[in-house]
């Protein structure tokens, strides 16, 4: 991403910051929206549209999902720094989140849940690690706007 000293089209910041803000907004909506509904989906009876597991198992799965998100930030940062670069990794993470949500919506039962949660979890963690790098790359280190962008 090119450094843009004179680009001030988004509240005094480069226009690319608007895109990143939107990506981050929808990723957080995805994460917290799923956190709020996931346990109900797992422990509601099959006849009610759920999977019919116990509340204890549902809580364990939700906790493991949350842990996966934050643990995968380490892997995502490594992939971004060493293999693909920040922008490609960010794009790949967004695609993983999308595929995870599609899996949760379209693949029935525990298989769809497992595939979907792994894809969304790894994608969300990777996206969290990479977004900050992309924001930092938009500014020169001496740019006064850099701190405000974060």
Write out the residue ranges for each language-model feature.
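Cytoplasmic membrane-interface "Motif A"-like loop-to-helix N-cap segments
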Residues: 82-94, 142-146
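Loop-to-transmembrane helix entry/capping segments in MFS-fold secondary transporters
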Residues: 17, 55-56, 141-150
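Central cavity-lining transmembrane alpha-helices of secondary-active solute carriers
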Residues: 59-80, 128
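Intracellular juxtamembrane helix-capping segments at the cytosolic ends
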Residues: 126-140
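C-terminal ends and interior cores of transmembrane alpha-helices
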Residues: 92-113
């Amino acid at each position: 991403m090119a450094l843009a000293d004179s680009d001030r089209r988004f509240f005094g910041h480069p226009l690319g910051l608007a895109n990143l803000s939107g990506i981050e907004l929808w990723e957080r909506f995805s994460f917290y929206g799923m956190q709020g509904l996931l346990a109900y989906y797992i422990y509601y009876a099959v006849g009610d549209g759920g999977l019919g597991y116990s509340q204890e198992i549902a809580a364990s799965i939700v906790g493991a999902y949350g842990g996966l998100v934050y643990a995968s930030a380490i892997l995502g940062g490594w992939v971004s720094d060493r293999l693909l670069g920040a922008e490609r990794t960010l794009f790949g993470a967004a695609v993983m989140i999308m595929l995870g949500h599609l899996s949760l919506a379209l693949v029935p039962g525990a298989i769809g849940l497992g595939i979907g949660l792994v894809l969304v979890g790894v994608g969300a963690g990777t996206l969290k690690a990479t977004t900050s790098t992309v924001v930092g790359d938009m500014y020169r280190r001496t740019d006064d706007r850099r701190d405000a962008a974060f």
